[in-house]
């Protein structure tokens, strides 16, 4: 009998902070299951979830505005510990009778917080000792408003020179508020604070580990699928690969994977996928060579959004054709992960904004009458990777840089042609190979090559050449929300450029993209 890995659970209410998912990831890293919900949940939903503790996230709004979000009243009557972070602390203070004011001086960035009273939250946690002998913490602040009066029965447990109540506590009710962000790495002891809250204050046991997640997923897949057959679109990416391994472990040959080679993959990628999953791991795989079909659908299309939609549409058509041949398949497996679930379940106050359409969300035919199997829908990407390692997938494959769903379709600018894809594949392979050779691959967050549909004059020997241009792109980022261009050594870039131009007939010039995000996006399209 597998352990109940959901036995202990934390509920995180999202007030719109860019860091909210980080809170959830930190709690999961502690080994405890948690879910992230919009702030406007009902008492009934909270009761049904039955959390051992609740965390109120930060957010961009001001508590001083009458229509700003508030925690459901039941949060403070549920009898469980509550931790308010930044905006979460402010709304806790205001809702429980304290006073919050807008400040003309924002606190943003590193700050030193002095602990003025002992508390369960900060027990044995310090970065330094002040002259008067009190513990001090190095933290990350990001707020304009501040708590000016704490509620009755609360005590101030930390201060900064500009923030009279940097943290507060009601030890009897186990309510805590911190004005800083313990979830970000800049708050040096942040992970320990969250661990104290989750384990010592909420009394949660660490049951959420890669091994127990696999055990639980396998049991659930077996229960759901029974003796039926399952079909999965295997791309060779992290999510679909881990889904394939999980379902294969659960039901073996009842799983059939369909690998669609759309002509938009990296160099030798199709061959690598077939060798790894078919030959090495022994999965049932059908390989569909659909390059011509995809390139034909992309003919004459230059707009990036239209290209994405065309690629998505053709994938669905090809997959649908193959699934109809598998008469006994009753279940469709998908690599949906928790951030996809969070995105689609946006708060009913709805403030989401689409920047780029995602090729893998929705879009399956209405007449595909199959049940869905989504074994990763509770997991963040970093958890998916750790589960993959536990399942025996190679590290280099799981921690490879992100590759867009539409593949080279959005790395060839403008119209996609076979000639362009072939040139780009080879140029990109050289760039990635050299990053590995120079031990730079894992020092950048993402690196790739872009094909520019413009010709440039070059010189080769005594002759003049008039060939295509490619751009190298490498960025450093923590969360892919913002990114800096990677300052790769000039001699390295020169070496890569020489190799590409000398080894690939058809490319005459290599440029390096030095745009950050913002204002640019990481991918060009």
UniProtKB/Swiss-Prot annotation:
Active site: 86, 181, 183
InterPro entries, A to Z: Class_I_gatase-like, GATASE, GMP_synth_C, GMP_synth_GATase, GMP_synthase, GMPS_ATP_PPase_dom, NAD/GMP_synthase, Rossmann-like_a/b/a_fold
UniProt keyword terms in alphabetical order: ATP-binding, Glutamine amidotransferase, GMP biosynthesis, Ligase, Nucleotide-binding, Purine biosynthesis
Enzyme Commission identifier(s): 6.3.5.2
A Pfam family recorded for this sequence: GMP_synt_C
Pathway: Purine metabolism; GMP biosynthesis; GMP from XMP (L-Gln route): step 1/1
GO molecular function, one term: ATP binding
Annotated positions binding ATP: 235-241
Leading EC class: ligase
A GO term from the CC aspect: cytosol
SUPFAM superfamilies cross-referenced by the UniProt entry: Adenine nucleotide alpha hydrolases-like (SSF52402), Class I glutamine amidotransferase-like (SSF52317), GMP synthetase C-terminal dimerisation domain (SSF54810)
UniProt domain Glutamine amidotransferase type-1: residue ranges: 9-207
Residue span, GMPS ATP-PPase domain: 208-400
PROSITE patterns: GATASE_TYPE_1, GMPS_ATP_PPASE
Catalyzed reactions: XMP + L-glutamine + ATP + H2O = GMP + L-glutamate + AMP + diphosphate + 2 H(+)
UniProt xrefs under Gene3D superfamilies: 3.30.300.10, 3.40.50.880, HUPs
Record's function text: Catalyzes the synthesis of GMP from XMP.
Assembly and interaction partners: Homodimer.
Name of the featured protein: GMP synthase [glutamine-hydrolyzing]
Protein's organism: Tolumonas auensis (strain DSM 9187 / NBRC 110442 / TA 4)
Lineage: Bacteria, Pseudomonadati, Pseudomonadota, Gammaproteobacteria, Aeromonadales
Primary gene name: guaA
């Amino acid at each position: 009998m597998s352990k109940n890995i959901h036995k202990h659970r934390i509920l995180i209410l999202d007030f719109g902070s860019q860091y909210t998912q980080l809170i959830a990831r930190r709690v999961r890293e502690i080994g405890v299951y948690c879910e992230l919900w919009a702030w406007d949940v009902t008492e009934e939903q909270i009761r049904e979830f039955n959390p051992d503790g609740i965390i109120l996230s930060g957010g961009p709004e001001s508590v001083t505005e009458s229509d700003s979000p508030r925690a459901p009243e039941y949060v403070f009557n549920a009898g469980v510990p509550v931790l308010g972070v930044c905006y979460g602390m402010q709304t806790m203070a205001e809702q429980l009778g304290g006073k919050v004011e807008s400040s003309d001086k924002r606190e943003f960035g590193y700050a030193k917080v002095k602990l003025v009273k002992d508390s369960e939250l900060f027990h044995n946690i310090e970065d330094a000792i002040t002259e008067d002998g009190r513990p001090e913490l190095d933290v990350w602040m990001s707020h304009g408003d501040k708590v000016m009066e704490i509620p009755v029965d609360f005590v101030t447990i930390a201060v900064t020179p500009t923030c009279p109540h940097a943290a507060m506590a009601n030890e009897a009710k186990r309510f805590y508020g911190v004005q800083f962000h313990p979830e970000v790495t800049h708050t040096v002891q942040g992970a320990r604070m969250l661990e104290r809250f989750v384990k010592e204050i909420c009394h949660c046991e660490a049951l959420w580990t890669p091994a127990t997640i696999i055990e639980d997923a396998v049991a659930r897949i077996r229960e759901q699928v029974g003796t039926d057959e399952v079909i999965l679109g295997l791309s060779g990416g992290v999510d679909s690969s881990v889904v394939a391994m999980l379902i294969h472990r659960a039901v073996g040959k009842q799983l059939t994977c369909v690998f669609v080679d759309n002509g938009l993959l990296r160099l030798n990628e199709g061959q690598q996928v077939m060798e790894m999953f078919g030959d090495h791991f022994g999965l049932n795989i059908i390989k569909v060579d659909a390059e011509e079909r995809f390139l034909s659908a992309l003919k004459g299309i230059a707009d990036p959004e239209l290209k994405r939609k065309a690629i998505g549409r053709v994938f669905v058509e090809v997959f649908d054709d193959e699934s109809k041949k598998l008469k006994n398949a009753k279940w469709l497996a998908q690599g949906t992960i928790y951030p996809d679930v969070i995105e689609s379940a946006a708060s009913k106050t709805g403030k989401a904004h689409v920047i780029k359409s995602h090729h893998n969300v929705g879009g399956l035919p209405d007449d595909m009458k199959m049940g869905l199997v989504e074994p990763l829908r509770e997991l963040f990407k970093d958890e998916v990777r750790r589960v993959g390692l536990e399942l025996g997938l190679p590290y280099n494959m799981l921690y490879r840089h992100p590759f867009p769903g539409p593949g080279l379709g959005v790395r060839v600018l403008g119209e996609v042609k076979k000639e362009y894809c072939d040139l780009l594949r080879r140029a990109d392979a050289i760039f990635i190979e050299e990053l590995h050779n120079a031990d730079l691959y894992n020092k950048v967050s993402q690196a790739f090559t872009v094909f520019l549909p413009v010709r440039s004059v070059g010189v080769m020997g005594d002759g003049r050449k008039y060939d295509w241009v490619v751009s190298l792109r490498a960025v450093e980022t923590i969360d892919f929300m913002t990114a800096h261009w990677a300052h790769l050594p000039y001699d390295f870039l020169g070496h890569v450029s020489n190799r590409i131009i000398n080894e690939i007939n058809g490319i005459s010039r290599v440029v390096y993209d030095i745009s950050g995000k913002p204002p640019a996006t990481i991918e060009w399209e």
